Each structure stands twice: as C-alpha cells, then as structure tokens.
Amino acid sequence: MTLNKTDRIVITLGTQIVGGKYVPGSPLPAEAELCEEFETSRNIIREVFRSLMAKRLIEMKRYRGAFVAPRNQWNYLDTDV
C-alpha cells in the first residue's frame, strides 16, 4: 500500500518523538522549517500536526507552536505509537 506524503511525515515525526529525538515538553521545529525539511506546504504540515495531536503525541500552544506531550498522555493503543 502506498502512503501519501502526510502519512509519511506523520510516521517520520512520530518515530522521532517516540524514539527520543524530541523529548516531552520540547518544541517541534516551526512550520516553515518542517515545510523546508520535508519539501511540502504548510497545509500538509498542519494536517500532520492534527494527526499527531489525535495520537496525543503533541500539543499545540497558541502563538508558540507544537510541543511534545508528556508520555503519560500518549495513545499507546494506536499502533503507530
């Protein structure tokens, strides 16, 4: 099965979060940086953030960006986590 760009980025960032590249409480790179890194649009990155929030891996803070959620909030029933 072929994954779309959004799914590939969700898997990549999710793996980095679970693997410890980004520790709980730390910020993820800004939307613009992620757009550049993954060569995609802001709409795709926002969709990625929505997916990661649904998995409870990140929290969005208004005017501050995306932050890694505490481990006790992660949705361990999700197979991607």
Q: What role is predicted for each listed range?
A:
Residues 1-81:
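Short linear motifs at protein or domain termini
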